[in-house]
């Protein structure tokens, strides 16, 4: 009997919120074993630094569904730089992609989800602008297309039902948003496993 495929999910708190749903959907039908770091993968530089440890702990994946972005594009007054430059973001994505490719896994890139258009932008707290999320998403999409990496557009999933998908903080996913993103992740994973 063939070994059950191993699916690795990488991403920030958005990933952490939909991962249990993805795990349930894929493992209940014995389609895959779903894993992901117990910690938040945060910004792209953090993922780049921690990925070897996570791969060592979690084992070689057959499929990787991955996102970095909101921690890079977000303005955080308690760090320097407050926002990671687009060039640094892309450099980190290239490095992470290179490490993932060395595992032999099929890689899926997921776009970063939007914030609610009414979420206030504050200079004294974490803050995001949708136009900046779009710019970082666009640059990442261009890179992934050049590298022939399939894309799961979670941004479009959430944006199409932004009122129904986002929690009260207008950033994180509520239960409906988690389910919508999990459905899209499962569909993308199944497609590359065909």
What are these regions (language model features)?
Residues 72-76, 116-120, 159-164:
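Short acidic/His/Gly/Ser-rich catalytic and metal-binding motifs that mark active-site loops
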Residues 89, 93, 133-137, 178:
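Aromatic/hydrophobic pocket-lining residues that form the small-molecule binding cavity
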Residues 78-84, 123-129, 166-170:
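Short glycine-enriched, charge-decorated loop/helix-capping segments at active-site entrances
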Residues 111-114, 154-156:
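Short, well-ordered beta-to-alpha junction loops that form the rim of enzyme active sites
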Residues 3, 47-54, 167-194:
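Histidine-centered active-site loop/cap adjacent to the catalytic His
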Residues 102-106, 149:
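A short helix->loop->beta-strand "cap" motif at the edges of active sites that frequently abuts
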């Amino acid at each position: 009997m063939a070994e059950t495929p191993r699916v690795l999910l990488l991403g920030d708190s958005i990933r952490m919120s939909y991962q249990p749903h993805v795990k349930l959907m894929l493992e209940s039908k014995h389609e895959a074993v779903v894993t992901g770091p117990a910690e938040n993968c945060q910004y792209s530089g953090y993922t780049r630094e921690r990925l070897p440890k996570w791969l060592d702990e979690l084992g070689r994946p057959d499929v990787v569904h991955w996102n970095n972005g909101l921690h890079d594009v977000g303005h955080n007054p308690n760090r320097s730089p407050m926002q990671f430059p687009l060039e640094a973001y892309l450099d980190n994505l290239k490095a992470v992609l290179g490490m993932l490719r060395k595992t032999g896994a099929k890689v899926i890139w997921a776009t970063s989800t939007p914030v609610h258009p009414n979420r206030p932008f504050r200079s004294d707290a974490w803050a995001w602008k949708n136009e900046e999320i779009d710019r970082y998403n666009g640059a990442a999409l261009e890179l992934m297309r050049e590298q022939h990496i399939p894309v799961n557009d979670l941004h479009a999933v959430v944006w199409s039902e932004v009122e129904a998908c986002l929690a009260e903080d207008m950033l994180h996913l509520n239960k409906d948003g988690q389910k919508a993103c999990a459905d899209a992740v499962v569909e993308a994973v199944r497609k590359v496993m065909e």
